[in-house]
């Protein structure tokens, strides 16, 4: 939604078709054939690849002794251009591409040594949800890139949350895959590492979910369900324990009617803010 709204805001006519890049591109070719419109390639074009290769030159200008570079791969334009620039200047620099586990098209294509149609599952990294890599980009990447690795949505979520909280960067899921890999698979000590953060087009609703999931993963947002006797003061006893632990109640759902709640009892589900895992574990222990 964020990308669509922004594009329409600049005056473009946006036609929504398909659930991933490949399906949308197929429709775009139909429209171009019917109307005579010009197709502008997203990645599989020499000029697009060359333009994105400027990123590689800028990396070398800022950090000429870099050891490893991590960057996202969808169709492969960014990776192909960057790896050409890097390897031309210094073949010893390691370039690692990162894809979503839901759309591992370039990963599988390089592995099979032939362009391979893969993927189709949903991923929050919609910017790299490409089922088939480009012809030009595949040939470049299979010959020059050192490695392609995969990450899942949970790892991407953690990376986005870390970028927002620590760096104050809003990076879209597809752009955060490099950091997502490094968080779970730490680089060798002493290495000079560059991570390319590509793109900031992220929907605000998704961003809210990312924040909640990031807080939950760190036990800073805690969901608890307790079964209480349905009598005056029972809930207050729970609240007193939470207050003593210096946690904050964000939301409460009080349920007497569900079939799994016995007569004379009440189920209470609470969302709590805590300071982290240690405080959360201490609170749970106090409530047991």
What are the functions of these language-model segments?
Residues 13, 67, 146-147:
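Receiver (REC) domain switch/active-site residues of two-component response regulators
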Residues 204-288:
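A conserved regulatory-domain signal marking ACT and ACT-like small-molecule sensing domains
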Residues 134-191:
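Active-site-adjacent helical/loop segments in soluble small-molecule enzymes
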